[in-house]
Amino acid sequence: MAFMGRIDDQLERSRVGWQRLTPGQAHAAQREGALLVDTRTTTQRAIQGELPGALVIDRTVLEWRLDPTSADKIPEAVPGMRVIAICRQGYSSSLAVRSLRDIGIDATDVIGGVEAWISDGLAVHRGASDERC
């Protein structure tokens, strides 16, 4: 049996209480109005490409931008919105979702992250992103 570190334990605990989405499910939910929020770094996005229609929000300000009661919220942050977080591989997005859910936001993330998104043949593009720092 492989040793699981503390962060692995935390990750497992963080995923309790919501249903994670496949890339295809996330893409469908985005088309139906959910906010797809990309938390990858600039370097990761330069390597993998940008996700069409995704909002890019740095992990360090994520909660402030998405909390509808925050003075620093983005215009899309409204009560009842659904957020789908996505990162490179689907790990840090789960921790972000736990934090968002803890402040009352309906959030989930994408199993396998952008790597799975690309593997499933979903679109990425090169060029400008919708950054909300």
Report the location of each language-model feature:
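Rhodanese-like catalytic fold shared by cysteine-dependent sulfurtransferases
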Residues: M1-L35, T42-R82, Y91-C133
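Short, surface-exposed ligand- or partner-binding patches at beta-edge/loop junctions that are enriched
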Residues: A85-I86
